[in-house]
């Protein structure tokens, strides 16, 4: 993870003590999301972290393929550095996110709303 994504990860971890997180650093399975979460409803989910300076959110072809193959319980959390806004997107909209960037409507906006959504996510 890049330096800004590492800081973002620590911010998420601090704000979600009720979620058990596993940080995934895997160079052999390209495209695997950054985080595996386990919430209070006994559900597993993955989160890809992105930090951006502008409207564009960039992904590797492997990351796009992962989210296309795994459309459920996969998420992308994006932090815009200038505004400090945090948005959560479902993995199944990754192609739209690539095309539209942060103009795409998120399923949740704001760090607290994003974290709360993941905490109470059900199957």
Walk through the language-model features, giving the residues of each.
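Structural signal for conserved beta-strand scaffold positions within catalytic alpha/beta enzyme cores
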Residues: 23, 48, 76-78
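Conserved catalytic cores of phosphodiester-cleaving nucleases, focusing on short active-site segments
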Residues: 35-37, 43-53
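Mg2+/Mn2+-dependent nuclease catalytic core
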Residues: 52-70
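Acidic-basic catalytic patches of nuclease active cores, encompassing PD-(D/E)XK
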Residues: 1-26, 40
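Charged phosphate-binding loop/patch that engages nucleotide di/tri-phosphates or the phosphate backbone
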Residues: 101-123
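Beta-rich catalytic cores
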Residues: 31
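Nucleic-acid nuclease catalytic cores
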Residues: 68-96
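Short strand-connecting beta-turns/loops that link adjacent beta-strands
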Residues: 40-42, 81-82
């Amino acid at each position: 993870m890049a330096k800004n994504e590492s800081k973002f990860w620590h911010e998420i971890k601090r704000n979600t003590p009720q979620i058990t997180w596993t940080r995934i650093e895997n160079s052999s399975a390209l495209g695997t999301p950054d985080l595996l979460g386990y919430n209070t409803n006994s559900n597993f989910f993955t989160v890809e972290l992105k930090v951006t300076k502008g409207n564009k959110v960039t992904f590797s072809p492997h990351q796009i393929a992962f989210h296309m193959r795994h459309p459920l319980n996969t998420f992308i959390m994006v932090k815009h550095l200038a505004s400090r806004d945090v948005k959560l997107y479902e993995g199944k909209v990754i192609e739209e996110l690539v095309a539209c960037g942060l103009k795409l409507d998120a399923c949740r906006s704001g760090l607290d709303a994003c974290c709360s959504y993941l905490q109470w996510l059900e199957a």
